[in-house]
Amino acid sequence: HDRRSPRARFGGSHDYEYSVAPLMGGLILVVGQWREIFWAIAAMSLISLLGTLFLIPESLPQERRHAGGFRTFLHNAGTLLRRRLFVAYMLVNAFSAFALMAYVSASSFVVQEMLGFTSTQYSVSFAINSTGMMAAAFLSARLTRTIHPRRIMRVALAVVSLASFALLIGSLFFDTPAWIVLPAFFFTVAPQGMIFGNGAAMASEQAREFAGTGSAMLGLGFSFSASLAAPLVGIAGTHSSLPMAITMVVGSLISIGCFVLAGRHTPSAQRA
């Protein structure tokens, strides 16, 4: 399973951004206004663009690259969409992102408007959860040396589902108390570090000859599902956590369903 470890470690380094970003945003608001946050985002985006253009070499060997432009991409994408294992793991990641984006979109309203936390306290809470996701990704990278990724994903998906249901119960019957909300947030967010990297690695194994197309489709599925979650969580306004909890439960359950389907189409010798 060593081939999967680098992707998990890369995911962990990516999760580091989620830990630092809210703290940076809180510091910017202390000395400036919300407009300065967007200037900071623009500056970092420009740095990323320049780094991509001039510092990061193409990692795919020349002999494995495909010519033909968008038409070739569509052909390769169609081929991958007929591979059930690729689609299943792509959807596992996509609906895990659906649940995660529900948290990202609505947690500030829940924590600040409903629980009464300050913006700085919320930023610290968000950073703690993101640090948990980063730590989970790095732990997963080590575990994959001896444990099959499906076993790791199975546990992580179960934890996310239980935490989402705990949040739903807290929203329905306990008026969204902090003693339920904060732990539920942590155990919804942190295990994602064990899901995204492993899910992407399992999907990529089904797209070895179309590595670029497979990566693009994984990113597209992730971004599209995340964009669907964002407007749903605000349906009841800023004083109800119920839409967020329902969205998180739905995302976690569909993700588990896709994971189960992936297991049914996995050769018995490769099952965890």
Features from the language model and the residues they span:
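A late C-terminal transmembrane helix in Major Facilitator Superfamily
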Residues: 200-240, 247-248
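Helix-to-loop junctions at the C-terminal end of transmembrane segments
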Residues: 136-151
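Juxtamembrane intracellular "pre-TM" segments in multi-pass secondary transporters
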Residues: 57-90
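Pair of pore-lining "gating" transmembrane helices in MFS-fold secondary transporters
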Residues: 82-100, 186, 190
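Interfacial helix-cap and linker-helix signal at transmembrane-aqueous boundaries
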Residues: 24-32, 111-112, 143-144, 232-240
